[in-house]
Amino acid sequence: MRLCDRDIIKWLDEGKLVIAPRPPIERINGATADVRLGNQFRVFCGHTAAYIDLSGPKDEVSAALDRVMSDEIILPDDEVFFLHPGELALAVTLESVTLPDDLVGWLDGRSSLARLGLMVHVTAHRIDPGWHGQIVLEFYNSGKLPLALRPGMVIGALSFEPLSGSADRPYNRRQDAKYKNQQGAVSSRIDED
């Protein structure tokens, strides 16, 4: 059963759930808390690679990822990021989120943005128990027009679901956690699998 707005506020007040900066009360509604777009992005660079062999040797996968991903792009607050039709880009939430070991989070994009073709997460919308860090957004523009995205705009909403008990292996205590304490638009670390 997901937390209602009253319980999200209670968990925030008690410090069991942390969203920093904390959303104002008008951004916690029904069963969600809104999150905003940060100012860090990554895009795919122009490249001539025919493919990336994701099951190849780790060093080759790592080198291929380095060739196709841009360095982190940090926008000033007054600039916009343009996402063109058919483009995939990584971005990050302005907020950092910390979940306890007995709570899982879910990120959903906004319906109003989806109706313009913007996918906020391609597939990865679960936020594991024990998570701490910013949330990377996998943007895809499936629409017909470029979309101007501004840092600080409301980009999605988080909902939270209590578990039947505390996880034995929460994200923050896993040795193989590739995105622990994530800050910024971190690109794929598939080569660390």
Curated annotation (Swiss-Prot):
InterPro entries recorded: dCTP_deaminase, dUTPase-like_sf, dUTPase_trimeric
Positions annotated to bind dCTP: R110, S111, S112, L113, A114, R115, D128, V136, L137, E138, Y171, K178, Q182
E.C. no: 3.5.4.13
Gene3D superfamilies: 2.70.40.10
Annotated pathway: Pyrimidine metabolism; dUMP biosynthesis; dUMP from dCTP (dUTP route): step 1/2
MF (Gene Ontology): dCTP deaminase activity; nucleotide binding
Skewed-composition ranges (Basic and acidic residues): 170-179
GO biological process, one term: dUTP biosynthetic process
Catalytic reaction list: dCTP + H2O + H(+) = dUTP + NH4(+)
HAMAP family the record matches: dCTP_deaminase
Quaternary state and interactors: Homotrimer.
Name of the protein: dCTP deaminase
Organism: Photorhabdus laumondii subsp. laumondii (strain DSM 15139 / CIP 105565 / TT01)
